[in-house]
Amino acid sequence: MAKEKFVKNKPHVNIGTIGHVDHGKTTLSAAISAVLATKGLCELKDYDAIDNAPEERERGITIATSHIEYETENRHYAHVDCPGHADYVKNMITGAAQMDGAILVVSAADGPMPQTREHILLSRQVGVPYIVVFLNKEDMVDDAELLELVEMEVRELLSNYDFPGDDTPIVAGSALKALEEAKTGNVGEWGEKVLKLMAEVDRYIPTPERDVDKPFLMPVEDVFSIAGRGTVVTGRIERGVVKVGDEVEIVGIRNTQKTTVTGVEMFRKELDKGEAGDNVGVLLRGTKKEDVERGMVLCKIGSITPHTNFEGEVYVLSKEEGGRHTPFFNGYRPQFYVRTTDVTGSISLPEGVEMVMPGDNVKINVELIAPVALEEGTRFAIREGGRTVGAGVVTKITK
């Protein structure tokens, strides 16, 4: 019955809970679901269903993630919760579950802890743009001054990592109490606090720009020459729209070239345009087959540039995940798989880091042997002889 009400006419936003272990992330996820279920805005998912997260494999990395969905009056949300700290690290670095914003859960009884800090840092690094804070376990704090102190600490921590700490919405409450209330079918004082939190999420986390509204980009997968028609490049459009007559650029590996789109085909049919998510063939005017190769991208003119040097945040696969069995050191030269191709690059480790063990996450500097279309937020895999040994995201372009 509840399924019928899920009409996708509301704007869609992806969020997730982050924060230190045992501060109540999963309980809050269950409480949000339970409180909104009393209003008929979602299906009830209990704590155990969320906590026993199925393991998924994303680029060969095992990640346990729970997905729940719910609605507020204004929006439709997909919400991610991870049971273990390592799962968060992997999830955020691989972008397995992209977040438009996050709810940072901090126990009011304990204040910010090491993983609180690490999750905020990761959010900054991997580009989670907005954070709303829930101070959980408010029922365990009798002292209003203590609550204020924790709030100040959290704001300071956010500011340290370049989030607007002073303007960040912070709502206090108790996920457990709200969950207990909701199970009786009522929204009491604790449930109201969860609704207040969701109202802040609605207000503070903007609706993300849809992929089709972003500048056109298509990674080149294959190149063909068609007699009498010219060169066709195929691939899946990552973002934006491409129309017949558009001027586009071919970026990466070699010097950037300009060309004009003379045709767009999908399943052998001629189209006026292709958009994000479509697998298409794009016919290019005056471009020779040998001018284009896998690993380049077709894009809107000036929207992305080729680079060889960048900083990245990476997760190194553990031995159990099929990764390396031994650490790597400064100067390690693996392949970086970006979109559709491998490019060799050398890794410099941060000062004071001697080596990186399988299962670690670390910030690295990379120099590629050929330029690739890159921007902050571009994801990549690190490969060695065709097998994935790490996953990462570009956090800063340096050259």
Swiss-Prot record:
Residues 60-64 are annotated as: G2. GTP binds at residues 19-26, 81-85, 136-139. Residues 19-26 are annotated as: G1. One of its GO terms (molecular function) is translation elongation factor activity. Mg(2+) binds at residue 26. Residues 81-84 are annotated as: G3. InterPro entries: EF-Tu_GTP-bd (IPR041709), EF-Tu_GTPase (IPR050055), EFTu-like_2 (IPR004161), EFTU_2 (IPR033720), G_TR_CS (IPR031157), P-loop_NTPase (IPR027417), Small_GTP-bd (IPR005225), T_Tr_GTP-bd_dom (IPR000795). Residues 10-209 form the tr-type G domain. It catalyses: GTP + H2O = GDP + phosphate + H(+). CDD domains: EF_Tu, EFTU_II, EFTU_III. Its EC number is 3.6.5.3. It is an enzyme of class 3 (hydrolase). GTP hydrolase that promotes the GTP-dependent binding of aminoacyl-tRNA to the A-site of ribosomes during protein biosynthesis. Belongs to the TRAFAC class translation factor GTPase superfamily. Classic translation factor GTPase family. EF-Tu/EF-1A subfamily. HAMAP family: EF_Tu_B. Monomer. NCBIfam families: EF-Tu (TIGR00485), PRK00049.1 (NF000766), PRK12735.1 (NF009372), PRK12736.1 (NF009373), small_GTP (TIGR00231). This is Elongation factor Tu. It comes from Wolinella succinogenes (strain ATCC 29543 / DSM 1740 / CCUG 13145 / JCM 31913 / LMG 7466 / NCTC 11488 / FDC 602W) (Vibrio succinogenes).
